[in-house]
């Protein structure tokens, strides 16, 4: 089992959600976050003064998936979230030691 964490542009969330649902992913967690990478930030004018905006709005999504669909899901996220411009984001894949469904007590892949 793997935990996929992806940082994407906010306007890509619905497309990514649909793409992974089409593969069979039944659950996703999305969080509004701020960050920067190579994109850095940008400057804005406010009341005649220039300000540097370092942190840009992004969306972090987290999905627990079975190893059997890992590559499909990662590929779907990358292809769907890509705009070809700086700031498209990143995908991180981590091992999951255990998953427990609180309601039923199911564990492992059955709990995903």
Locations of the language-model features?
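Positively charged, small/polar-rich N-terminal and surface patches that mediate targeting and assembly
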Residues: 1-112
């Amino acid at each position: 089992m793997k935990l996929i964490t992806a940082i994407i542009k906010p306007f890509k969330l619905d497309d990514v959600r649909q793409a992974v649902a089409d593969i069979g992913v039944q659950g996703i967690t999305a969080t509004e976050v701020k960050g920067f990478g190579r994109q850095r930030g940008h400057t804005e004018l406010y009341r005649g003064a220039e300000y540097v905006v370092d942190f840009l709005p992004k969306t972090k999504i987290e999905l627990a998936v079975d190893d059997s669909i890992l590559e499909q899901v990662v590929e779907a996220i990358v292809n769907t979230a890509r705009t070809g411009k700086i700031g498209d984001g990143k995908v991180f894949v981590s091992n999951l030691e255990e998953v427990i469904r609180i309601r039923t007590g199911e564990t492992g892949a059955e709990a995903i």
